[in-house]
Swiss-Prot record:
Keywords: Chromosome, Developmental protein, Differentiation, DNA condensation, DNA-binding, Nucleosome core, Nucleus, Spermatogenesis
Region (Disordered): 1-31
Principal cellular location given in the protein's record: nucleus
Protein name according to UniProt: Protamine-1B
Chain ranges passing through the membrane: none
UniProt record, GO biological process: cell differentiation; chromosome condensation; spermatogenesis
Length: 31
């Protein structure tokens, strides 16, 4: 059971960097 909880935490960490990269791309296109 502890292994399934670790996989859930990994997906949450990967979703945070994805939002950061999308905001950086939008700022570069506006310039």
């Amino acid at each position: 059971m502890p292994r399934r909880r670790r996989a859930s935490r990994r997906i949450r960490r990967r979703r945070r960097p994805r939002v950061s990269r999308r905001r950086r791309r939008g700022g570069r296109r506006r310039r």
